[in-house]
A protein has these predicted regions:
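N-terminal beta-alpha lobe that positions the nucleotide/phosphoryl donor
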Residues: 1-205, 209-218
Length: 218
């Protein structure tokens, strides 16, 4: 944080674009905004709404867009309670992380205990996300939005099963194993989300196609 702010004080930029810096830049957005830095593009509050599980779930409910059943937890006991409530297998990952970093598929209580021990040992700051694992087809769309409309070059289909870090996944473009109706649904949901979040610039949304339904992952 201090290194970035030192550079900003020296360079005195008109504003800062965080869309090209990965998760590191996303995490710095709130800090920079609180220190008076002009964030160009998507507003900091909109970025937080996309990253915060409770706020994002509320938005999806308003837009009538489905997502796998899931909860946030801070302790191992909470994680075990949630996993047994929604039933194994479950997908576990830290919040405020893009692309499935540090993500696992847990099949039993021992997996939960081992994962939470590692996360808690690292010093947890944000909740851990636990979702019902759906063995479907993972799809991903990149687009650019001006706040009123979106433009996307297409939809990628991941070859690996859902739950694999996107940086380690192979994807094909365009998606070849998905019906036209599901593709149209993805485009429709992506436009709704991008506009509802007041997106100005790049947006990436990941979905699961499962039993002819579309679910948002992140």
């Amino acid at each position: 944080d201090e290194d970035v702010m030192n550079i900003i004080r020296v360079e005195k930029p008109v504003g800062v674009v965080v869309a090209f810096g990965g998760q590191t830049a996303i995490k710095l957005t709130k800090h920079m905004a609180e220190h008076g830095v002009n964030i160009l593009g998507t507003p900091p509050d909109a970025i937080d709404a996309a990253e915060d599980r409770e706020r994002f779930d509320e938005l999806l409910e308003q837009l009538k867009i489905k997502r796998p059943q899931g909860f946030t937890v801070m302790t191992c006991d909470e994680a075990l309670e949630v996993a047994n409530k929604i039933h194994y297998p479950v997908l576990m990952r830290p919040s405020y992380v893009l692309g499935g970093q540090n993500m696992i598929i847990a099949f039993n209580d021992d997996d939960i205990k081992e994962y939470m021990a590692i996360i808690l040992d690292q010093g947890i700051e944000n909740p851990v996300l636990i979702d019902k694992y759906l063995m479907g087809t993972e799809l991903e769309i990149d687009a650019i939005c001006d706040g009123e409309d979106i433009l996307s070059p297409g939809i990628r289909e991941h070859i690996e099963r859902t739950g694999i870090h996107s940086g380690d996944s192979i994807a094909v473009y365009p998606a070849w194993n998905v019906s036209d109706s599901l593709i149209n649904r993805i485009i429709e949901c992506s436009k709704k989300l991008a506009i509802a979040l007041n997106t100005k610039g790049l947006v990436n949304i990941q979905y699961i196609a499962y039993h002819d339904e579309i679910y948002v992952i992140e």
